[in-house]
Amino acid sequence: MQSTVQWLENVAFEAKSESGHTVVMDGSPAYGGENRGARPMELILMGLGGCASFDIVTILKKSRQDITDVICQLQAERAESIPAVFTKIHLHFVVKGHGIKEKQVAKAVELSAEKYCSASKMLTDGGVEITHDFELIELSV
């Protein structure tokens, strides 16, 4: 996997992925940014949510659950000192659909956290405490 990050101006950068997608990153105005894009640490948090959500959707589809939406809400805490690394992250999954079995969702969340999510594994190996929970929303037919 490869990526290129190019400086645009001030503290703004454009990242290009190997698959051809671009993302603009920018610092906060307090550091000379203009709020033109997500902060780099926000992208790490979003990447974790995307990685875990990918697992949840894939696992639930394989277990034939009739899901219509999966939302991952993340809350993170960072160290007070430099480097201001993540210390705690909580992932809350909101799973919507028809006749979804709670046991299947619990299993999907557990498998993502303990086996499949590369981003989660990398962060927990680095000392980040990651917790998970979920809620089911049954949609009427």
Please tell me what each predicted stretch does.
Residues 1-46, 57-141:
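Extended beta-strand/beta-hairpin segments
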Residues 54:
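Short glycine/serine/threonine-rich phosphate/pyrophosphate-binding segments
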